[in-house]
Amino acid sequence: MSKVLFIKANDRPVEQATSVKLYEAFTKAYKETHPNDEIVELDLFAENLPYYGNDMLTAMWKAGNGIELSADEQKRADLVNKYLNQFTAADKVVFAFPMWNFTVPAVLHSYMDYLSQAGKTFKYTAEGPVGLMGDKKVALLSARGGVYSEGPMAQMEMANKYVRTILGFWGVNNVTEVIVEGHNQFQDKAAELVAAGVEKAVKLAESF
């Protein structure tokens, strides 16, 4: 039995959001084919995460150095550790997100900030930082209305690139992607492109 964490970073309704279509198709297929796995679903917009700023940085630094925390600092550290422990405990993690304005939604960026903790997801060494999450299996389900996999727009893609960079920093190398792109750019092919992506998501779920 595996512990699996499903993370959704899109609050648009499914009929309007391709990444949500991928998420729902993947989740349904995974549950049907892995009935004994322990699954946690995390809707980042519903979680309403506070931005990761000075208060949380200070709280986590003090906690990591054995310094007594105030009641407010302890509350903030507990919130970060809630998501951090949930992530580190998972054997498999699924991220579903759109590309908005060339990058990920702010809630996903905040979530990744929570998880980037020295001594937890990575550590510092004399030779440089070393990732600690190398045993994780990750799937990325994403959508972008234009074409960013090649051509002049490729350099502007900072959504999947960002997530993969952070995961790599944490030592995660087992990453599989399902990307739907161009469905807004090529309206006449939109249904076909989305359907193909959903089919890929289902197949990935069955073998994930």
UniProtKB/Swiss-Prot annotation:
Binds 1 FMN per subunit. It holds the Pfam family Flavodoxin_2. It catalyses: 2 a quinone + NADH + H(+) = 2 a 1,4-benzosemiquinone + NAD(+); N,N-dimethyl-1,4-phenylenediamine + anthranilate + 2 NAD(+) = 2-(4-dimethylaminophenyl)diazenylbenzoate + 2 NADH + 2 H(+). Its cofactor is FMN. It comes from the Bacteria. GO terms for molecular function: electron transfer activity; FMN binding; oxidoreductase activity, acting on NAD(P)H as acceptor; oxidoreductase activity, acting on NAD(P)H, quinone or similar compound as acceptor. Keywords: Flavoprotein, FMN, NAD, Oxidoreductase. NCBIfam families: PRK13556.1. Quinone reductase that provides resistance to thiol-specific stress caused by electrophilic quinones. Belongs to the azoreductase type 1 family. This is FMN-dependent NADH:quinone oxidoreductase. It comes from Brevibacillus brevis (strain 47 / JCM 6285 / NBRC 100599).
